[in-house]
Each structure stands twice: as C-alpha cells, then as structure tokens.
Design a protein with these regions (language model features):
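Short C-terminal tail/terminal secondary-structure segment
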Residues: 2-5, 110, 174, 251, ...
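Canonical Rossmann dinucleotide-binding motif of NAD(H)/NADP(H)-dependent dehydrogenases/reductases
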Residues: 5-38, 200
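Catalytic loop of short-chain dehydrogenase/reductase
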Residues: 114-118, 153-192, 197-206
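A conserved structural motif in NAD(P)-dependent oxidoreductases
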Residues: 235-246, 257
Length: 275
C-alpha cells in the first residue's frame, strides 16, 4: 500500500539536538510513524525525560544519550553502544546547531562581523558543521554497512540559500555600527551543510545511502509582533512556520517514499527563497 511507504517501522534513526524546538518535532514524527528515534543532546535528564514521553505515547523503544557532538571519541563510543543495543543504524538527522546570539555591550555590538568574537566563531562551527561531519563519519558509516543502506538528512535553513535580511533587526535611534545583525556563523554553517549534503550524496550512493538537506524557514516562537510583521511581508505565504510543519517533509526524506531522492536541497520556507 502506498501509505506504508512513509512508515518507519523497524528503523533506528539518530537525531541530534533532539530536545530543541525542532529536534523534538523531528523525533516525535519518527516515533509516530513506527521508527525508533535515538535522542542525542547534552543533558542526559532531558533526553531521558523525552524518551520516556515518546515511549509512553507511541509504545516505542526510544532511548536518549548525552553526547557532545564536537567530541569524536564520544560519538564513536555512542555509535558502538547503539549498534550493540539495536544492531544497526538506518538514519541520521543532523539537527544540532548553536543559535548564535551574542551579548552586546553599550560600547560594542558583538553580533556584527567586525566585532564577532573568534571563540564564538569556533564554537558555532564546531557544533553546527564539524559536529555534523563527525556524526556522518561514525553514525553515517554504520548506515553504509546496512544491506539496504539508509537516509541522512541535514537540517540546513533558508538562510543557507539566501543571505539574511539584516533590515529585520534594525532598530530606530541606533547607529549603524551598533545595530544587531544575524551573526555570520549561521549562514556559514547552514551553507556548509548544503555542500556536505552534495558530497555525501555521491560518496555512499553505491551503498544505497541517500543524503539530502532540508532548508526550513523561521518558526513562530514568541517573537515580537513587529518582527513577525516584517518577516511575513518577505514570505509569499505571509507568515512564519509552525513548529510541526516540517514533520511531513522529514518523514518523506527518511522513509521509503523517497528512495530515489539523493543530493536534493529542499526549501520548506513558505516560498521565501522564490523571491
């Protein structure tokens, strides 16, 4: 039956940043459609609580691990634990990333490129890009050993396809050199994930491992009304996304409904990048 193509029964899928706003939605979609989400985040208590919540609701066997994805040894050991417990890994959702926000002072706005701290640059790249690489190196390699391969989904952004419109953050009465901006690392990380996706799409294709990127737009999550209004006029659908609006796309990308999808960069952003 056609609807069965979207099912994830028996599939073991690693989700990084699993207790964040979208990470929770990704994991919930996997569990709802019969898969076993392996929840990775920094807090063991948070992933344990979320795993218990998912298992109670969907009668699954989700499990959580505290893993720093910038630590290769931790990832390598965790991959062995997962294989020891479940025997395989079928999918990976590279979702973890810093949300780069830099505290400003009265004298200097550190979000601006000319003032951006090098240590924050290194940290953002380490989590969002190096972390994704390390997860692919170890979890993805395990996927490549499956007889039927599997699926890797990198969570990029509409801002991996277009530049951030810094006018959204402009405030009256503040000089240009003090205005807030979307930090440079966000664009670098999200664009880098697109390049990584294309590389992987050709690297393990002979082992039936597909790699694709989703480029979600911004999610409505308590932003000020004036900001929501400014963003909305830049989106053909005239609104930001709801947090559950990416679940269907993710299920399609992970499931057998998309077995010929490979190397695709899929915008899910209300049409923003079409303008």
């Amino acid at each position: 039956m056609l609807e069965e193509l979207f099912r994830l029964d028996g599939k073991v899928i690693v989700v990084t940043g699993a207790t964040g706003l979208l990470g929770r939605k990704h994991a919930e979609a996997i569990a709802c459609y019969g898969g076993t989400p392996i929840l990775l985040d920094l807090s063991q208590q948070a992933v344990d609580n979320f795993a218990n919540e998912l298992n109670a609701k969907y009668k699954g066997s989700s499990v959580g691990f505290s893993v720093d994805i910038t630590n290769e040894k931790a990832i390598k050991n965790n991959a062995k634990l997962i294989i020891g417990r479940f025997g395989k890994i079928d999918g990976l959702v590279n979702n973890a990333a810093n949300n780069p926000k830099v505290e400003d002072s009265k004298e200097v706005n550190f979000s601006r490129l000319e003032n951006f701290p090098l240590d924050i640059w290194h940290d953002d790249i380490a989590v969002g890009l190096t972390g994704a690489f390390l997860c692919i190196k170890h979890y993805g390699f395990m996927i490549s050993k499956n007889p039927n391969g599997g699926s890797i989904v990198n969570i990029s952004s509409d801002l991996g396809l277009i530049a951030p419109d810094q006018r959204l953050y402009k405030k009256d009465g503040i000089s240009k050199d003090k205005q807030n901006v979307k930090p440079v690392t966000y664009s670098v990380v999200k664009t880098g994930l697109i390049g990584l996706t294309r590389y992987l799409a050709t690297y393990w294709a002979d082992k039936n491992v597909r790699c694709n990127a989703m480029c979600p737009g911004g999610v409505k999550n308590g932003q000020p009304e004036d900001f929501l209004k400014e963003v909305s006029v830049r989106i053909p659908m005239a609104r930001m996304a709801y947090s559950d609006e990416y679940q269907g796309t993710l299920l399609w990308m992970l499931s057998d409904a998309s077995t010929y999808l490979n190397g695709a960069i899929i915008p899910v952003e209300g049409g923003r990048t079409a303008w």
